[in-house]
Every structure is written in C-alpha cells, then in structure tokens.
C-alpha cells in the first residue's frame, strides 16, 4: 500500500493542470534550476501554443512558457511520440517566442534570451547520452578561437559570449536514461522516466513534488481523467509500435524478395560468364591442336598465357 500511496503524477499532466498555479511554482522552479544549472525564479506563466486544454487533445505534446526574474523566456515541452521535422518545429517555436515578446518600436536590445527544454519520450536519433545541449558560438575559421561580443548594459561595456544571447536548446532523451540516480539532475530524469521520487531527495523541486504531485491527493474525478490520459498515451504508443513492427516485417519481406530476384539475376549472369569462359577455353584447345603457339592463342582469344596453359591441361 505504501507503493500505491507514493505514486506520483506524470510531469506532462502536472504541467498542464497543476504547475501553472503560483502555489506550485516551486516544483517548476526546482526543475528549471537543475536543468539550467542556475537559480530560477518564475515571475509569470505566458500563453503558449500547447497549454490550452482542448477537447481534441491527443496527449502528444504539452508545453509551458515562463518568464524568469531576468526577463528571459523559458519553454518546456514534453513530446510523447515521434514527430516529423521535430527540431524544425522547435526552432520555429523559439523564433516565434522571441518576436512575440518584443514590442513594435523597441530596439534590438529588448530581445530576450530563450531557453528551450524538450523532454522526449521517443527516439529522436542516434547518440550515447540522454541529455544534449545546443548553443550558438562563433569560432574562428583559421584561429579556432571563440568570438566574444562587446555590448552595453546600464552605461557599462560588458563582454558576452554569443551563447548568452542566442537561444539554448536542451534535449532530454528520457528513454535513454539507465543509471542509478545520484545527482539532482539524474533524480529528475528518473522521475520523468519512471515516476520515482526518493523519500530523502534533496533535489530542488522534487521535495515539493513529493507533496504536491501525489496521485491519491487528486479527487476521484481528477484521477479518472488522469488515468484516461495515461491510457491514451499507452494506446498511442502501442499503435505506433505495431506500425513500426509491421513496417519492419514488410521491409524484411521486400528485402527477401529483392534478394531472391537479385540472386536469380546474379546466377544467370554468372552462368553466362562461365559459358563464355568455357567457350574460349574450347577454342584455345582447338587452336593448340592445330599447331598454334600459346602466345598466338593469347593474342587471338584475349586469354592470358597462364589461362591458355590451364585451359589445355
């Protein structure tokens, strides 16, 4: 019964239903503090493409857009199934966030840094790590040094790396995590993957999550809606998994058929080649019987002298 009582709500459901409330900002702030490796204080939750609850929700993508105390924009997105051109859509979402949060007439100084965190439950591609970070830097073509930008802040010239200005992309490949959780980052990824939170966790945000994201803290109606959400994800994953298996079987069948066809074609080609070679050997033997030298036979048939000698043995 203890295990049941320690069951926790999935993070995508929490983002959609609970973490937008100011009283629950502690969970989200802890998550961002760990993944961005700096203290994060949320001052506002902004409207985003996927944060409305819609009747035709397919449970595929959930996102939340927040603004921190420095005015920077943070997008957290959870993607349950694969999507064609996923990175292109992430890029578009970041570009849209930048343009949406600068007013007409503002200078480019008002452009804010954007962090994009993607929590992925599908195989995006090949890689040995479970977290990948993408940042912009300018590297000297000949010198290989990193360009540092001079800019002005509060009448003071400061130097910045381009990565402090351009968006930062973080891809969390949840299904690739197979470690014993020791660090706060690993504890968070373990929760994202398995729904497990250690009773003695000290990871920012997870202490609050243990209290506020308990499954049995929800009402019967909320639990029913949550269970339907989980069922929808499982059904969707099963359908996609079966489609992949069927595709693989079809591919194997096509490969076998192609292999048989190629084998027949290769057999015919090899047979023809062997026939032509045997014909040349017969001609070489007849020429030798009629008194022609090995050198003359090689010149006429195109066979080497060594091949001529073999053909008459």
Where are these regions (language model features)?
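Elongated, amphipathic alpha-helical interaction scaffolds
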Residues: 1-313
């Amino acid at each position: 019964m203890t295990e049941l009582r320690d069951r926790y709500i999935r993070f995508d459901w929490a983002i959609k239903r609970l973490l937008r409330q100011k009283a629950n900002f502690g969970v989200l702030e802890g998550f961002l503090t760990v993944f961005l490796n700096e203290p994060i204080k949320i001052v506002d939750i902004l409207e985003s493409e996927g944060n409305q609850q819609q009747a035709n929700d397919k449970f595929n993508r959930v996102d939340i857009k927040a603004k921190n105390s420095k005015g920077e924009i943070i997008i957290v997105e959870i993607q349950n199934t694969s999507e064609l051109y996923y990175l292109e859509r992430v890029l578009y979402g970041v570009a849209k966030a930048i343009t949406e949060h600068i007013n007409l007439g503002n200078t480019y100084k008002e452009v804010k840094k954007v962090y994009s965190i993607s929590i992925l439950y599908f195989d995006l591609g090949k890689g040995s790590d479970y977290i990948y970070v993408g940042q912009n830097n300018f590297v000297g073509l000949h010198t290989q040094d990193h360009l540092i930008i001079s800019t002005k802040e509060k009448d003071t010239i400061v130097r910045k790396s381009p990565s402090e200005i351009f968006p930062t992309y973080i891809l969390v490949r949840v299904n690739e995590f197979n470690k014993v959780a020791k660090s706060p980052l690993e504890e968070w990824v373990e929760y994202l993957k398995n729904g497990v939170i250690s009773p003695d966790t000290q990871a920012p945000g997870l202490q609050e999550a243990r209290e506020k994201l308990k499954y049995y803290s929800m009402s019967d109606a909320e639990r029913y809606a949550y269970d339907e959400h989980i069922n929808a994800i499982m059904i969707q994953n099963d359908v996609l998994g079966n489609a992949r298996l069927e595709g693989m079987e079809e591919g194997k069948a096509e490969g076998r058929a192609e292999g048989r066809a190629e084998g027949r074609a290769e057999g015919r080609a090899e047979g023809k080649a062997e026939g032509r070679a045997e014909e040349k050997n017969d001609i070489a033997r007849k020429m030798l019987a009629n008194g022609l030298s090995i050198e003359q036979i090689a010149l006429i048939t195109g066979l080497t002298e060594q091949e001529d000698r073999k053909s008459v043995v």
